[in-house]
């Protein structure tokens, strides 16, 4: 349950030097390039579970959906589809629990005003690693910067470990 709940906590990492643009209606910043999305998501997520999510709301378009894929007992994939408000309510229920998602490795593909970011992550709750997985993020360029249109997440499991190529320097740890 914990990896499924938190695998939605999306991306992390410190990306220095990416220019940011003002986000609509929240006083937050939007990335000026798709490669800045992981750092923007990290900043919007990291902190107490019940913190204000205005920056996360500014980063995702209103119609954005988050899909959490998991494997059932029979190994068949299942999914849960949520709005950002659904996700915020689930995370907020954890109270002051500290959340932190650390990006392990990512790459970005861009064509014109659309981009896809494929990112592996490790998720921490109160300093303890509770999950790892992959985030598939779609984004669009708007006048104020890049915004997320959708996120699909699958947490690592015993039958679906993270491949070496998605870990820093190819490590399996």
Predicted region positions:
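Short beta-strand edge/turn micro-motifs at domain boundaries
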Residues: 132-160
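Bacterial N-terminal signal peptides
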Residues: 4-17
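Hydrophobic pocket/interface hotspot
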Residues: 56, 64, 117, 139
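A short, polar/proline- and glycine-enriched secondary-structure boundary/capping micro-motif
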Residues: 77-79, 127-130, 158-165
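Short, low-complexity N-terminal intrinsically disordered segments enriched in polar/charged residues
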Residues: 2, 21-59, 166-172
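Sec/Tat-exported extracytoplasmic proteins
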Residues: 41-49, 60-64, 68, 88-91, ...
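A mature extracytoplasmic/lumenal domain signature
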Residues: 60, 70-72, 119-121, 135, ...
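Surface-exposed, charged secondary-structure patches
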Residues: 22, 26, 30, 65-66, ...
């Amino acid at each position: 349950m914990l990896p499924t709940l938190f695998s939605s906590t999306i991306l992390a990492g410190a990306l220095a030097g990416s220019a940011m643009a003002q986000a609509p209606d929240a006083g937050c910043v939007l990335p000026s390039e798709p490669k800045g999305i992981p750092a923007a998501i990290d900043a919007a997520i990291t902190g107490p579970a019940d913190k204000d999510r205005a920056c996360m709301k500014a980063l995702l378009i209103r119609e954005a959906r988050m899909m959490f894929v998991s494997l059932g007992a029979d190994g068949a994939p299942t999914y849960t589809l949520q709005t950002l408000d659904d996700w915020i309510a689930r995370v907020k229920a954890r109270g002051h629990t500290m959340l932190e998602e650390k990006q392990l490795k990512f790459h970005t593909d861009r064509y014109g005003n659309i981009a896809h970011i494929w990112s592996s992550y490790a998720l921490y709750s109160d300093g303890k690693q509770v999950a790892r997985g992959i985030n598939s993020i779609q984004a669009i360029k708007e006048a104020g910067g890049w915004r997320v249109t959708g996120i699909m997440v699958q947490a690592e499991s015993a039958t679906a470990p993270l491949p070496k190529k998605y870990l820093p320097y190819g490590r399996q740890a």
